[in-house]
Amino acid sequence: KSVRVDAIKPNRMKIELKLGDGQLVDAAHFTGSLTARWLHGTPAADAKAVLQAQLSQIATRFKGYEGYSFDDASKYFGTEEREIVTGTTDAQGSLALSTDELSSLEGLSPGMLSGRFTVKVFEKSGDFSVDQQVATISPYDTYFGIGVATQKSDWGDEYLDSRKEHIIKIVMLDSKGKPEPGSENVLVSVYKMDSYWWWDASTPNSQAHYAKNALNSNYKTLQA
């Protein structure tokens, strides 16, 4: 594909974008900041700024809990784009970012999400400078993890032998991966999948659909 060189405009502003704590974005309490300066150093004052987020599903993982699963298998989150903040920079070229546009992710996402954030700062002419940043988004404050030692078949599939006794480990962590204090009553339901589950769950979307249907075939319920 050919691209006309004159269609590509270099940034005329330097943009500094800070999201969350620099490592994790809290979807329910999104905060951040941006500062825009012209390349010669003058603040880009009174400039319109737009922040967009491209969201996609990722596996939820915490250091030290590699053998645990934290994602809701009955949920699927496809790639989605949202415009989350629109504002105007102050005299110093700065803009505080806050929004509740991501709070609706709670209950929709199976776990953590990846966010590709794109900020555009506009000139009076309509041209704009752009910057991007990728960050992990946490839609939840607390994550329950389930850990169980599985066996592998000759084809490499993991399974549990129903004729044997198994230990199921449960942990409750905050969004930073630290154990939550206190105690909670947990109801654990075990579902037995048929031998063709791998065919019915060949994609992330169909996996979620299969898991939802499996909720109607309870194999065993445990109290913890």
Protein language model features and the residues they cover:
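A structural signal for beta-strand and strand-to-loop patches characteristic of beta-rich domains
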Residues: 1-224
